[in-house]
Amino acid sequence: APGPDGLTGTKGSMGEPGTDGEPGSPGPQGAKGETGLAGRRGLTGIPGKQGRQGERGEPGTAGSQGQQGQPGTQGPPGLPGKQGETGEPGESGEDGTPGPRGERGAQGERGATGMMGPSGDPGEAGIPGADGKAGERGVPGAPGPVGTPGLPGMPGQQGPMGPIGAKGSKGDVGPTGERGYDGKDGEPGRDGSPGPIGQPGIPGEKGEDGVPGSDGTPGSRGDSGPRGLPGNPGPPGRPGALGPSGPPGPQGPRGPRGEPGMKGPAGPPGRPGATGALGQLGKTGLKGEPGNQGRRGPPGLQGDPGKPGQSGPPGPPGPSGPSGRDGSDGQKGSSGEPGRPGKDGIPGQPGSNGKDGEPGTPGSDGRAGEIGPSGPIGPKGERGTPGATGPMGNSGPPGVQGSKGEKGPPGTNGRNGSPGISGSRGAQGPPGAPGSSGQNGVDGGTGENGTNGRPGLKGESGAPGDPGASGSAGPAGPPGPKGDTGPPGIQGEKGRRGADGIPGKTGEPGPQGDQGPKGQKGEVGPVGEKGDKGWTGTPGDPGPQGDRGEPGPPGRDGVDGPPGPRGAPGEMGAVGDPGLNGSMGEPGNKGPDGDLGESGAKGPDGIKGPPGPPGPPGPPGQPGMSEIASYLSVGNLEKGPGFRLYSSSGEEMPKQKIKAENVLKDLDEKDKEMDSLIAPDGSRKFPAKTCYDLFLDHGNFESGEYWIDPNGGTVKDAIKVYCDKKKNSSCVYPTNPKISDLVLKSGFESKEDKWLSKAFKKSEEVEYDAHYTQINFLRTLSNYANQNVTYACRNSKAWEDGQHSIKLMGSNDMEYHASSKISLRPTVIMNECANGGKLDKWGKTVLEIDTRERSRLPIVDVSAFDVGREGQDFKLEIGPACFHHIKY
């Protein structure tokens, strides 16, 4: 029989793991599992290959017209216009002041002896003598002595007007008149053609986070973890059936921002858009400096005859003319009958003068008498007929139209002209008083010419004679005094470089140089700041359509490329379907403060407040005037007589009337002051808030200097500015606009930055005629500002390249120069100092800051970088800081 069970043996060591059993049959379907946790976001996939360029899209429909662009920058000066037609003759000038009285002329030649005067009255009868015998006819007596010269004859009638004198030789060129005042600004030139497209700008700063993208596709399964230690074998369960898929888990948290994709290729340029509307006229450019003197043109066309000028004042006496020729001898008179000779009577007492006897036989011609003194000057002759029209000159080349100058001061009197041809002999004067009968004298010889007579007064100006041949050019007049440096002109087209010479005064104009050959196309420059809208170009021809490429796989988002050049506006595309609402993004950072908004509409009147406390008693008024009261007051039956019945007595009426007039005058002045308070007129007493407010209240006011008070309050800190009506701006001028004669301090020669305020012996910052609080308010009341600086150079560079240039410091201590980023870089309007200018000659570079960041202006300091060596020099001219106002 079996024995009893033995004791339980010790537990054996663990056996080797058994081999895997065969798969069990599928177990029953398990219960639905709980929703699993959201899986982590998969790793970012490898960027796909760059897709091929897509086929060019159909042109979109035309877009709506863009907003009006800002006025373009002033284009370069246009080519000189054709010479204008000859203007209408100017109105006659005013009579000049009479010339100085001429010196007394030399004694004129003695006039010819006058004709015999009429017979005198008969004398009283003498005592009759005894009749004598008739004697024989006596022998003619010897010639008696020459009688005394007769009295001068009466002045002869004025002779006919002599022929027009030959044209005198051309007088010397008169001295150059004083420089006239600057003419008014000319009409603004046409907008220049758009400049070339600049090079692409540097990449912008990283933008803010965009709206979160849609969820990515699930990542691939991760690698298996390391195998765990083997566990104790469990009892083999029956395999369960495969359960259904669980519902998707909740949306996981947003994954981190993916790596930036590769930079995509630049898209093809869009087709040119439709022609835009014509832009507004650009701002008026600054006045250019006077150009070089042009060549002397050939004579212009013959102008129409001018209107006859008014008679000028008497000119200075001309030199005496030559003596006139002797007149022809008069006809011999008829012989008188001889009287009978009487006997010699006893000499009686001298009787009274008897009647004049009949004229005796004329004696032979006596010696020529001396020429008598000149008679008084006859009346002016009639005006001569106009001369024939001269030949037409060659047309001159078109000159540059200059600005109209004001009338210059009258020139000095010219030198006396050459003597004219002597006039013909005048008609014979009336008979002179009778001379005593002389005996026939012997023929006298021709007398010597007498001294010159006094010159006659100048007759009226004759009509213009035939135009003389063109005279040779007179010597150049001395240069006028140097005017103040004008504001910078608009950059002209760059001409050929002339030969270097020693700077001197302007010489005679040289011949016009030939146009230089067309330069090679330069490399594309960096993208500049957005320029003002230029003239709309004509649409270009569309390019050939490329072959359609196969669509490539989508690539990763590339890094934002630099902004390309602005394309022409495309046509408007079709309206797309509305997109799905995106998830709300995270709140963005606070943006920069916007520009000052326009004033809102006037709100409704508020509720009337409670009455305020009574004010303090006012000062005592001026004495009243019962005279005014007597006009204004009338009594009535209910309340008794008006106070006019109690007015003062009639004796005081005149005083009261004067007082009443003074009061009315004061009231009128107060009324005007109230008007000035409501609509300030820009005076020192009533300054406007800004120039825009001034022109808003006074539309008839023109551009000029006015007082403004931007910060309001007391008018003691009002500032005087230049108000530009066209540009709607208030311009503040520096107190020291022109800076020159600067000498470097020792130790600054090697430093690159040489600021006005530190590096020069006569150091100075640029200051302005305005308190900084007023300028702050001007900035607030404007929406953009601009200012320019002119750097005049001699052997000194101003703007060499993108790394080296002068520097401007704004009032916010920011520096603006060639290597600044684009938004801070000044605009170069003219650059003659890029390479130091022409050798030993002055040139200039003009820079402008035009910005909506009004805190940058005005400019307070300037730094030069290429000065200090021998032969180098520079000057500065700081323009006004102009704040352009908001139209509210």
Swiss-Prot record:
Top-rank lineage group of the source organism: Eukaryota
Domain Collagen-like: 3-60, 513-571
Molecular-function GO terms, alphabetical: extracellular matrix structural constituent
GO cellular-component term (any): extracellular matrix
Gene3D superfamilies tied to this protein: 2.60.120.1000
Disulphide-bridged cysteine pairs: C731-C882, C793-C833
Cited Pfam families: COLFI, Collagen
UniProt keyword Ribonucleoprotein, yes or no: no
Region (Disordered): 1-627
Residue ranges, compositional bias (Low complexity): 59-73, 148-164, 194-203, 422-440, 460-475, 508-518
Domain Fibrillar collagen NC1: 661-884
PROSITE patterns: NC1_FIB
Ranges of biased composition (kind: Basic and acidic residues): 179-190
Biased composition range(s): Gly residues: 441-450
Entry keyword set: Collagen, Disulfide bond, Repeat, Secreted
Tissue: Component of the acid-insoluble organic matrix of the aragonitic skeleton (at protein level).
Keyword Secreted among UniProt keywords: yes
Subcellular location per the Swiss-Prot or TrEMBL entry: Secreted
Biased composition (Pro residues): 311-320, 610-622
Homology family: Belongs to the fibrillar collagen family.
Protein name: Collagen alpha chain
